[in-house]
Amino acid sequence: ARQGFPVRVFEQSPEFREVGAGIQLGPNIFRVLDKIGLKEAVLDDAHRPPAQEMRDAVTGKLITRVPLDDAFFKRFGQPYAVTHRADLHATILNACLGNDLIKLETNQRVDGFEDSGDGVVATLGNGSRVNGRALIGCDGMWSTIRESIVGDGKPRVSGHIAYRAVLKRSDVPDDLWRPDVVLWAGPRTHFVHYPLRRGELYNLVAVFHSDHYEEGWNAEGSTELLWQHFKGQRPEVLRMLERIETWRMWVL
C-alpha cells in the first residue's frame, strides 16, 4: 500500500485482535518499523529494559548480563524493547485503518489459490474467488498457503511447552520486580520475566519439556504439571510462579 498498490486483508476471525502476552523486539524489527513509520508509536507503548540477564534457576548465580544501553544502540543502530502483543497489533491495525488503499475483511478464510499466469486467484471459505497480482500468506503456523506451496505438512511439536501469564505491576512484590529481561535456566526448563506497557504490567513465560499438551496456542495450562517441572528451583522463581492462578499454554 505504501507503494500505491491496493491491498485486501482477509481475516478468518470475526474481528482483528491479539490476545497474546509479551514479545521481545530486537534491532531488526525496529529497522522495519522505522521504515514503515511505526517505530515511535510502538516505543510509546513499550518498555526499554536496561539489560538482558541469564541466571541459574537452581543456584541463583548470574551466568551472563548483556547491557542494552547506548553502546548497544550504537552497534546495531536501533533499540531493543519489549511490548505487549496486543499493543503492537493495535499500532499496526490503526495504521492500516488510516490507509485508504488497505481494505480489512473479517470472517474470510483463504482455503486455496491458483496461479493465473499474470496474477493469482484466491478461493475463500464461502466459495468466492478473488483476483489479485500477488498473494501473501500471513496465516500463521497452521498456514494453508505455506502448505500449498511447500508441502511440508503439519507443524512438528518440539516437545517444549510455554506457559504464559501477565500480572499487573501492583501484583508483583517489590523485591521480585526487575526492569531487565531475566531468564532463569533450569534443568530442562527456563523461566522468563520482564515488564510490559511502560512498566504497568509484568510478563511471565515458563517453558519446559512435556508430552502432555493440546494443539494450539491459547489452551489453559495445568498448574500441577508446571510445579512438577519447576520444583527445587530458586525461591525467586517459585514465588513468582505461585502468583499465577491461570496459565495459557502455548505448544512450541
Region spans (language model):
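Glycine-rich FAD pyrophosphate-binding loop
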Residues: 1-21
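Short phosphate-binding/catalytic loops that engage adenosine nucleotides
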Residues: 5, 38, 235
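A structural signal for isolated positions on well-ordered beta-strands in alpha/beta enzyme cores
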Residues: 8, 103, 192, 203-205
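Conserved N-terminal helical subregion
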Residues: 26-168, 211-227
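Short beta-strand micro-motifs enriched in acidic
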Residues: 115-116, 194-196
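Flavin-dependent oxidoreductases
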Residues: 161-194
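FAD/FMN-dependent oxidoreductases across multiple families
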Residues: 175-176, 187-189, 197-200, 208-252
